[in-house]
Amino acid sequence: MMSPTPEDDRDLVVVRGRLRMMDNGAEHDRERRSYTAWPHLCCGCTIGIILTMFVIATTLLLASLFAFSYMSLESGTCPKEWIGLGYSCMRVAGNNATELEALDMCAQHNSKLIDFTNAKTLVEAIVPFGSTNASFGNIFRLRDSRSTCILPTIGGPISVDCPRTCSVVCQRPRPLSTTASIIRDARIYLRLERRDYYEVYSSILSNAIMK
């Protein structure tokens, strides 16, 4: 067997050098890929965390809209010149008013005529401090009936036929807090609730408390 010639040794050195360069290039490529993979991985984790937080927040928001009773967030404070009674606020809007005038007076205050239960409770509260003479015009016109009104007496309120003109007492729900108003507006916007739901619900609660 022939021994390698000097030319063969030179060729071997060249080949080894090329192989070493190829190994260095491959290692450099691996390092470069590892360096570029970290930013992508961190970005993906950040996006995943943000999406998870968004889903959780959306779920909590929808749950509050469907299940939360915003009635517990009412401010409990009636506006100036209004009297609080149960879940309602009431105000004497005028005297000697016809039925149409009474409806218009309450509409101007974004309210409606007082209902029978609230009128009865209000009369029982004010009779000891005021006149019980019907000539003073303190016959209340009611929302529930166009022909029956309430007359305060010492023995308590009684139902009477409505004269042409009566006193006007308006009522509306107690105002909600800012948070409760936002929840209510969102429910109405999403058509999860009718606009008059709070008024009807507060009236039912007031009647239940006063019975």
Curated annotation (Swiss-Prot):
Ranges per topology, Virion surface: 68-211
Chief location category: virion
Membrane topology: Single-pass type II membrane protein
Gene Ontology cellular-component annotations: membrane; viral envelope; virion membrane
Chain positions carrying an annotated carbohydrate: N96, N133
Positions on the Intravirion side per record topology: 1-46
Signal peptide extent: none
Parts of the chain that traverse the membrane: 47-67
Cellular localization per UniProt: Virion membrane
Keywords (A to Z) from UniProt: Glycoprotein, Membrane, Signal-anchor, Transmembrane, Transmembrane helix, Viral envelope protein, Virion
InterPro entries associated with the record: CTDL_fold (IPR016187)
Annotated Pfam families: UL45 (PF05473)
Domain of life: Viruses
Family listed: Belongs to the herpesviridae HHV-1 UL45 family.
Record protein name field: Envelope protein UL45 homolog
